[in-house]
């Protein structure tokens, strides 16, 4: 098996773990989970520059790509570039991070990226742990559940980019790879590590491929961390990150108080201004969060793609209202809406055109408002929106701070030279409770 380290690392302190994440909010999710386990973590936006590499001192480095909805060949190319960077940093383990709802299509690209990473690292069998029990994602008999609902009945079947129409992950992943896809089910998990190791060894002896691991509770994650702590390559959601981090801390005899200190580093860039919230997610969780925030009497502005298309001056009005509103209170600007209204806009404008119109509006708002003195910090909800905003602001990396909700921390946004930009929270659409926005603002006020 090929070693992970190719050349001398460009950091004084070598990270033990390198994560390749397929979108920005997903990267922040796993970075937060690593910090929860006591591991100092840096998240980069795309492949980091040499100067940024030189400034990084961390136990884990998360490279955030925007590859989730890309054609498989493009996603593979980006992922292999990230792998090369992480190997140069000297990491001992690679973690391919995707969403806990396994966001993909029959055309890819989880299977193809996994195959490419296996080939590059000469790994015969890739274990997938997609579950995230703390957020209600579990895998039983190879089927992914959101709460008590099968994935394809949870609303994810209506996802505009990656509609998930089959909860059977063995079958779904099998459509994305020519390699064998198998399952280590609950009946094996309950017997313990020895039986799991035996199943993996037998599968590998038969030619290897991909194995989906059942996981229904946190104790299952602890067991999987024990099994996979020395694996050169693992794949899944962020669920496995915290127990892996804790095992690293224990193995290196890191004092408990040091782990606790690392896990609660507050962002240092919180300013006196108010919080700007930009939401492009149309998930049911985000829609509930918006409605809850609206009921507090907060300043909320909705972006309607049909009106944006018909009224070019509308965006200037929204910007003026946002900038003025931030002088007195937090402001939420959202394009999030019901499936019916989203589809109506897509039918009228075209799905791609509607998405780009909204994305550009958020970019304009972020560029104009993010560095104003009345803007204290920024929250962005939705993976695609987060990617667009982060790129527009020239953010190259995130130093992970305190957790707002599982998988969503406050962070310090850094530029390509490692200089501080502002405090930022990137929220995956389905994460957080109904009161998320108010909780985030309250935490920022305490930091």
Task: Pin down the residues of each PLM region.
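N-terminal basic/disordered segments at the start of proteins
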Residues: 10-57, 77-81, 129-134
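General beta-strand structural signal in soluble alpha/beta enzymes
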Residues: 19, 42-44, 94-98, 126-130, ...
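Short acidic, glycine/serine/threonine-rich loops at helix termini
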Residues: 30-32, 106-110, 137-145, 195-196, ...
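A structural-propensity feature for long, helix-poor, extended segments
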Residues: 58-67, 326-328, 412-447
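Conserved, well-structured core segments that form the ligand-binding/active-site neighborhood
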Residues: 147-322, 327
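C-terminal structural cap/anchor segments
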Residues: 322-383
């Amino acid at each position: 098996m090929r070693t992970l380290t190719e050349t001398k690392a460009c950091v004084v302190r070598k990270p033990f773990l390198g994560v390749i994440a397929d979108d920005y909010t997903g990267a922040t999710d796993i970075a937060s989970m690593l910090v929860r386990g006591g591991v100092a973590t840096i998240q980069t936006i795309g492949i980091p520059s040499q100067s940024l590499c030189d400034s990084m001192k961390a136990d884990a480095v998360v490279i955030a790509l925007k590859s989730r909805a890309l054609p498989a060949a493009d996603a593979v190319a980006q992922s292999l570039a990230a792998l090369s960077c992480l190997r140069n940093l000297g990491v001992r383990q690679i973690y391919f991070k995707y969403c806990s709802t396994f966001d993909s299509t029959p055309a890819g690209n989880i299977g193809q990226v996994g195959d490419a990473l296996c080939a590059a690292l000469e790994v015969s069998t890739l274990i997938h742990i997609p579950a995230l029990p703390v957020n209600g994602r579990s895998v039983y008999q190879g089927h992914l559940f959101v709460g008590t609902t099968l994935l394809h009945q949870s609303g994810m079947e209506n996802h505009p980019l990656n509609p998930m129409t089959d909860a059977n992950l063995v079958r779904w992943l099998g459509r994305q790879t020519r390699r064998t896809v198998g399952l280590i089910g609950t009946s094996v998990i309950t017997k313990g590590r020895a039986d799991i190791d035996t199943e993996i060894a037998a599968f590998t002896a038969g030619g290897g491929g991909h194995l989906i691991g059942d996981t229904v509770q946190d104790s299952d994650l602890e067991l999987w961390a024990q099994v996979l702590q020395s694996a050169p390559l693992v794949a899944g959601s962020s669920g496995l990150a915290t127990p892996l981090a804790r095992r690293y801390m224990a193995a290196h005899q890191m004092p408990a108080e040091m782990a606790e200190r690392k896990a609660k580093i507050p962002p240092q860039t919180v300013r006196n201004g108010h919080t700007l919230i930009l939401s492009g997610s149309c998930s049911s969780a985000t829609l509930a969060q918006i409605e809850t925030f609206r009921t507090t009497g907060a300043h909320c502005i909705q972006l309607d793609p049909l009106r944006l298309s018909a009224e070019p001056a509308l965006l200037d009005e929204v910007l003026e209202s946002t900038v003025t509103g931030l002088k007195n209170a937090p402001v939420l600007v959202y394009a999030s809406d019901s499936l019916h209204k989203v589809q109506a806009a897509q039918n009228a404008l075209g799905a791609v055109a509607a998405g780009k119109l909204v994305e550009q509006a958020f970019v304009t708002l972020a560029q104009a408002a993010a560095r104003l003195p009345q803007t204290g910090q920024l929250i962005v909800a939705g993976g695609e929106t987060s990617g667009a905003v982060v790129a527009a602001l020239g953010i190259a990396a995130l130093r992970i701070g305190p957790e707002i909700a599982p998988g969503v921390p406050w962070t310090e946004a850094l530029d390509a030279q490692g200089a501080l930009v502002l405090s930022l929270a990137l929220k995956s659409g389905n994460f957080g409770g109904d009161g998320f926005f108010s909780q985030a603002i309250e935490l920022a006020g305490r930091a």
